[in-house]
Amino acid sequence: MKLKLIVNGCEAPDDYKLLRTTINTVASLRKTAILRFNSERLTIISTPKSSLNSSNNGTILRGDTGQLWCTIPHDVFRLYTVISARELNTITMECNCDSLLSVFKRYDRVMNQGSSSNMTIKLQSMPEWNTNNGTLSGGTAGGVDTTSKPNPICALGITFEEIVHTSGPNDAIVMNGGVDEHNGLPTTVGTGNLLASNKVIMHSFKVPVKLLFRAQDTRIQEPMINYIQLMMYKLPPISGEFGSAFHGFIRRVERYSNVNHIHLMGVKKKEHGNEGDDVELKIIVNELDWHLEICWNGPLDSVIQRQEGLTDNPSQNQHIDTDGRQEEGSLPIIEADKPMSSLYTNTRDREMEENIRYDEDLLRIEDSSIADTRGNIYTADTSGDTEFNDISVMVEKAEQESSSTHEVIIRCKDWKVCSKLYAAFEEVVLAISHDESCVFHCSLDRGSLEDSEDVEKPRERGQIIYYIARSKGL
């Protein structure tokens, strides 16, 4: 296999910022991360338990923990070469986030001092680092093999140049005489005869990484989201008018250190058409013998995903239960689940389509009849002899259809991660999959559309997606 990357922070500052921000965000939340390279992009994956230190090299990611998935398009790099014999040309490894981030910080200092150098990243074999693997993990106990094959240890070799400007110790000062052009008076100007020279310093680092076997890589699957029972909120930007207030709303629950779970609830009232007036978002604490509701009263945009917008390809509609449980009496598994990263690329188009559908519903004229869950049809009676029980059923049904509620119970510590992500990015979307999971989606821009080589097709944006499985059922 072969891996070689080149990035230049001075020539492409927006692309470098995307890469640097992603690594910095993951390092601020996790100690280790999985780097998965393929022909299309780099994916950075991390959970609180993404470690291969166990002797059995078991599964890396667990479904009951918050999973952080970040994608970086391949055209962020000036050179992106990945050669592998695996499916989709994949190379997967685990690395320490702080070690990788420290190299980027050093590169930042070099750029700030005026040097414009390429950062080259190569995967290097390190046989001397693997000499003790067989000794430490091999052997038998009572004739039984107690260990499995260890993961090979390699290095990400990172190099870049720094140009240091130096000058000679015996610089002479020459006094040159002349005449000022404005007033014709003689003037004297002192100029330095500097004996300047440049010194090139080559910085080289080796970041240890642990290559994953094919079976381990296969077990790392992006969580699926049920797009039938999903509500998506476009949150106010942190630098906007309501950003500071919404950040305080998210962090309000952090005041209570003894709270373990929060109840996240989103309500959309269909009868209102004004922006922000038809959406409610609540954080409910209902434990320790007390009940608390924290409501956001500011503007909020929402998009409800419907079944009509789903693909008809069954191979893409596979369901993975994020918490690994299917309780009795729960809704049947619906073939309408996809990773958030694959479906968010056209969110603006879906929002426009939803608004058009909503306007069409307002203008549609239908028969005045309502059917309940048992199949009974209630038709408006103009004779005035409608029974009261029919009216009550109609009112109850109308109230249910006038609003849509999505709620989920998650861990409070996972919600604290969301507050950190919200403060770091401008464009954030919160998605609530009813009684299943919660997703915090952050988009990373790559400059304006004019900066793209293809003006008609904008460049792929970077994504940071935090998947949160429910901590318990409603």
Swiss-Prot record:
UniProt keyword terms in alphabetical order: Cell cycle, DNA damage, DNA repair, DNA-binding, Nucleus, Phosphoprotein
One Pfam assignment: Hus1
Sequence positions bearing Phosphoserine: S452
Major subcellular site: nucleus
Keyword tRNA processing: no
GO terms for MF: DNA binding
An individual GO BP term: subtelomeric heterochromatin formation
Localization per record: Nucleus
Stored InterPro entries: Hus1/Mec3
Function: Component of the checkpoint clamp complex involved in the surveillance mechanism that allows the DNA repair pathways to act to restore the integrity of the DNA prior to DNA synthesis or separation of the replicated chromosomes. Associates with sites of DNA damage and modulates the MEC1 signaling pathway and the activation of RAD53 in response to DNA damage at phase G1. The complex also physically regulates DNA polymerase zeta-dependent mutagenesis by controlling the access of polymerase zeta to damaged DNA.
Miscellaneous field: Present with 414 molecules/cell in log phase SD medium.
Self-association and partners: Component of the checkpoint clamp complex composed of DDC1, MEC3 and RAD17. The interaction with MEC3 is performed in a RAD17-dependent manner. The checkpoint clamp complex loads onto DNA. Interacts with the DNA polymerase zeta subunit REV7. Also forms a heterotrimer with 2 RAD17 subunits. Interacts with SET1.
Family: Belongs to the MEC3 family.
Protein's name in the database: DNA damage checkpoint control protein MEC3
Lineage of source species: Eukaryota, Fungi, Dikarya, Ascomycota, Saccharomycotina
Gene: MEC3
